[in-house]
Amino acid sequence: MEEVNKEAVETRNLNFLEEIIEADLASGKCESVMTRFPPEPNGYLHIGHAKSICINFGLAKKYGGKTNLRFDDTNPVKEDTEYVDSIKEDIKWLGFEWENERYASDYFDQLYEWAEELIRKGLAYVDDQTQEEIRAGRGTVQVPGTESPYRNRSVEENLQLFREMKAGKYADGEKVLRAKIDMAHPNMLFRDPLLYRIIHAHHHRTGDKWCIYPMYDYAHGQSDSIENITHSICTLEFDVHRPLYDWFIEKLGIFPSHQYEFARLNLTYTVMSKRKLLELVKNNFVSGWDDPRMPTICGIRRRGYTPESMRMFAEKVGVAKREQLIDLQLMEWCVRQDLNERSNRYMVVQDPVKLTITNWEPGKVEWFDAPLNPADPEGPSRKVPFTGEVYIERNDFMEEPPKKYFRLKPDGEVRLKYTYIIKCQEVVKDAEGNIVEIKCTYDPTSKPGAGEWRSVKGTIHWVSTEHAKEVELRLYDKLFTEAQMGQIPEGEDYKNYLNPESLVIGKGYAEPALLEDNSGIAVQFERVGYFFKDPDSTPEKFVYNKTTALKDSFKF
């Protein structure tokens, strides 16, 4: 797998899928574009699905076409309406609307009829072998498969057995329906693939009507054909399935949908295997599927990522035919770009030390106007209370600073953001030598917009101790310590690379206006980073998740 850094991410040109679509439209191969997004409702969508959603819906929109949402609900054991609902919520959150909501189960009757047609054409048969016998009989890439002893049953016998399978006469695994193709075919998928298996389980939509269910390779292409899908876009691992996709369509003589493949998304410091993510949830390594450290769409939404930033990310990553490893910092860059333009600003102090202004009038409160977003100078402002005692960040003061240190120091001056210039006069320490208070004086003539403007090199944020609101801060980092999680040695437990510091819970002291913010997106804690109000918040306890840092060395 090729690692892609910021320079390697493609600039925006026509990708190969756009070239195919434009050629198809120009030649008349199709009159309009119809795509689909076909998730299986057996789990929560992740960032890789988000890319696929953006591609399928985005291509259709660009070329004036439509996109269906089709749930591939062919395995009743693993599927649930809970996942159906979450998938629909995720797609809407990303900003897309589907043309039709469809289910593979809508087509069970038609798929069954086509299966009988294949039997009548001598292209399918009922096999009594066990799963293990079928697997062994397929052979290997170097060794041809072995024909089943049941392969040459008559059409009449196969029809009778298949109908008995449908009627519930047989137990799970007792019989299967297989396509009759070529047991020596170089493509292993052509060695008499399974079409139907017996599963006596309640289906989330069809109930107990069916006890036989179609396999993915059989249901997928035919469902596309029923919906007149012109461009069936899959990830690269399905390229070997395409000849079989075409074989079924050809033999049944139905609308010729076409499958195309693109490289799936691989991110640094991330796993997207459904099995591994489920293990993280079940073993309480994370709080749930929507844990902000998870690569699920509901997880990144809870962390504070915006749909605009995810669409931007999908656009920047682009569409490729080759597997790539994309730097997680690109996704962080995208959300930072979006939030920098739109997010409201507030001051929050995480590691406070008290700063006392000795020449401030006791009990006096002065309210300052501060812009909610400097990018919109004509936009709304907020009121910030200023008093003679404030909190500043402990690391914004140094007794013995290095050269070019522009924050507060003994006898040094800084501006308290939006207010006055102050000068450090005295440092108070406890018995252990820890700084507990910094005493300063302020220059009353240095108020912004009043008198002669005087500049200083340092400006720091602060919060009035009298008005400070305590909030819980959840500081999230990468879930894993290894960048290339897909390249860890075979047999090694991926959980060995879990980052023990992926979540640090602390507290901060916020200006009161923060608690009144109803923008619905992450806000910027000035000079700190972007934070999103967590659903765990209550009127008595406000919780903020760190979305991303304010700055990063990554540039696009």
Model-inferred region functions:
Residues 1-12:
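Basic/polar N-terminal segments that are highly enriched at the extreme N-terminus
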Residues 10-22, 26-88, 204-235:
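N-terminal catalytic cores of NTP/NDP-binding nucleotidyl/phosphoryl-transfer enzymes
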Residues 28, 56, 87, 118, ...:
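Residue-level signal for inorganic ion chemistry
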Residues 38-42, 70-78, 100-109, 132, ...:
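Conserved short loop/turn motifs at secondary-structure junctions
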Residues 73-75, 81, 103, 117-276, ...:
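Active-site cores that bind ATP or allylic diphosphates and position pyrophosphate for catalysis
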Residues 83-109, 114-115, 122-125:
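A glycine-rich helix N-cap at a beta->alpha junction
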Residues 256-334:
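Long, charged, mostly alpha-helical binding arms that flank functional sites
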Residues 314-556:
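Substrate/cofactor-recognition hotspot
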